[in-house]
Amino acid sequence: MTAILFWCSLVVVSSVYLTIPLVTIFADSFKVTPSQAAWAGSAFSFAFAGGGLFFGVLSDRYGRKKMMLLGLLLLTVITPLIGSVSSFSWLVALRALQGLAASMFPPSVLAYAMEMFPIKRRVTIIGFISTAFLMASIVGQIYSSFIVLNFSWSYVFYILFAVYLISSILIAFFIPNGKTQQPDGSFFSPFLRIGDIFKRKGLPLCYIISATLFISLVGFFTTLGSYLNSSLFGLSHQDILWVRAVGIIGMLVAPFDGRLVAKFGVKKVLCCGLIFAGIGMGLLGLWPNLIFLVSMSVVFTTGIALALPALISLIGRIAGEIRAIAVSFHMFMVFIGASLGPILSIYLINHGGYLFTFEVLAGLLCLSLIVPFFIRLEEPRS
């Protein structure tokens, strides 16, 4: 079951990053500017962020498995249509619909893991799912780049039809049903509980870290890519992608978070992850050596991979019975951070250079390190 949840999380979230290597291809194919072509990614991201909050709340009412399966089935229908469009407006519209469909999965799978696995295994399972989320940022780009080099951009989406169909079958037949709350009240009743997350002491503080982690992660990818493409290194976009791929090594630590949390506690593991990420980010720009940069990028991604599962576990523990809503808001804040990351990084690069950008992002991680000290943990809620 863990392998299925890992696989489905990877292929769903990879769709967020598919169009990053395709921007110039879309610009040429549809005769639009690169900034307009970037809307193929932005439309997905905005729909994914908003939809995650909406559907995560509904999973409380209708069940986690139903929401995961519905999302995958809709992806199976919508995704191949994207490959067949001849209008850029339709491309953007269908990518937005794809984002809404994909947004049904992440908050549901995280809430499912928290409910269906015993406490001792919970952080480990969340670690595997978090690893899939993090790896998706690289795997999605590598996949679409490989397909475009060998076929055409349309096949990026045609092939995913089969991937999502197989994933739907796996969820339908090999994943047991989760818990479903009794549907009391109207359809909109669950949404009235969103305000409850701000009444739980510590949850709003957790969301500061949620945003900061992904401002740093996406800012890291943006700044590192520009840095390696500069005259100092002169790497091609394909070479840069492989440098980023090395970061997967650091992400592989996430499944071991459960053992670390059991031994040291969730807050200590979270702080340790933030320290690792801050050190890796802070040292990145100090020495313009490719091997050193790659090494520090692994340190950085190791820190993120340690911090993210611990943070999700902490949110679930504080939230208790409203964990689905709490995790949905976490995903919303994650994508707010992911949207702000490139904007902040480009601004900092233009006004202060690469070293300055790395240090500011490291500073954000260091500031977020203070936050866990203001979070008090009570006995775990059911």
Go through each PLM region and give its residues:
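Conserved MFS/SLC helix-loop-helix module at the cytosolic interface between two early adjacent transmembrane helices
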Residues: 50-86
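C-terminal transmembrane helical hairpin of 12-TM major facilitator-type secondary transporters
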Residues: 267-311
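Helix-breaking motifs and short loop linkers at transmembrane-helix boundaries and internal kinks
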Residues: 31, 63, 84-90, 118, ...
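Juxtamembrane intracellular "pre-TM" segments in multi-pass secondary transporters
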Residues: 176-207
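Paired small-residue
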Residues: 74, 78, 89-97, 291-299
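Helix-loop-helix hairpin linking two adjacent transmembrane segments in secondary transporters
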Residues: 90, 119, 128-175
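Cytoplasmic helix-loop-helix junction between adjacent transmembrane helices
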Residues: 94-135
